[in-house]
A protein has these predicted regions:
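Transmembrane alpha-helical segments of multi-pass membrane transport proteins and ion-pumping complexes
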Residues: 37-41, 88, 104, 108-112, ...
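Residue-level signature of transmembrane alpha-helical entry/exit and packing/kink sites
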Residues: 21-32, 57, 61, 76, ...
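Alpha-helical transmembrane segments and their cytosolic interface
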Residues: 2-33, 38, 153-183
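Generic transmembrane alpha-helix motif of multi-pass integral membrane proteins
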Residues: 59-73, 110-115
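Interfacial aromatic-anchored transmembrane helix boundaries in multi-pass membrane proteins
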Residues: 40-57, 82-112, 145-150, 154-155
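Membrane-embedded alpha-helical hairpins and interfacial helices in multi-pass inner-membrane proteins
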Residues: 53, 93, 97-98, 116-183
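Hydrophobic transmembrane alpha-helices
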Residues: 17-66
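Short helix-perturbing small/polar motifs within transmembrane alpha-helices
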Residues: 27-32, 38, 79, 100-133
Length: 183
């Protein structure tokens, strides 16, 4: 496992020369995905903090950020995609799959470009940028699905909430990474 302070921009530092190391890596990624899914499902049961559709903390994104810094881009994408799909299935919100994917993939693309350049001590900044991009991606999906730009009026509230929730999830992800044993 890589150290949290030295992110690899690609697929992490794991070399899969042995079946054991490959199995261990897959097991660790499956556990991270399960934790992300649990956080997503628990958060889905919490009443909204504000009366604005789409505003939530994004607790599952803590795990995506941790995966970026421990395993790299490719594995972070896999954890994200599996969590989004299974989260939609298990929560019974298959109609929200498009919005989750559009927000998640836009956020991922921006974070994948930026995370090698943002040190762990500023993970909160990457998380804030990612949260804002997630909200922009969801608004773009809503415009396409609804065929109107009227939903753009949600954007200011979503951007503000993205900054706040992104800062929170980034600080938590940074604290998690700081407490993991160094490899």
């Amino acid at each position: 496992m890589r150290t949290a302070s030295t992110p690899s921009p690609d697929s992490g530092e794991h070399t899969m020369n042995t079946p054991h190391s490959h199995a261990a890596r897959l097991t660790q990624l499956a556990l991270l995905t399960a934790v992300a899914l649990i956080l997503f499902l628990v958060e889905a049961q919490i009443p909204p903090l504000v009366a604005i559709p789409g505003v939530k903390l994004g607790l599952a994104n803590i795990i995506t950020l941790v995966t970026f810094y421990l395993y790299g881009r490719r594995d972070a994408l896999m954890v994200l995609l599996v969590r989004i799909f299974l989260g939609s299935v298990f929560s019974g919100q298959m109609l929200m799959l498009l919005f989750s994917l559009s927000g998640g993939l836009f956020c991922y693309a921006v974070c994948a470009l930026l995370y090698p350049r943002i040190p762990l001590k500023k993970l909160w900044l990457l998380s804030m940028i990612g949260a804002v991009c997630h909200n922009i991606g969801q608004i773009l999906a809503a415009i396409l699905v609804l065929g109107t730009a009227d939903v753009i009026w949600y954007l200011p509230a979503l951007l503000i909430s993205g900054l706040i929730s992104g800062c929170f999830t980034g600080l938590v992800a940074g604290a998690v990474l700081a407490r993991l044993p160094r490899a």
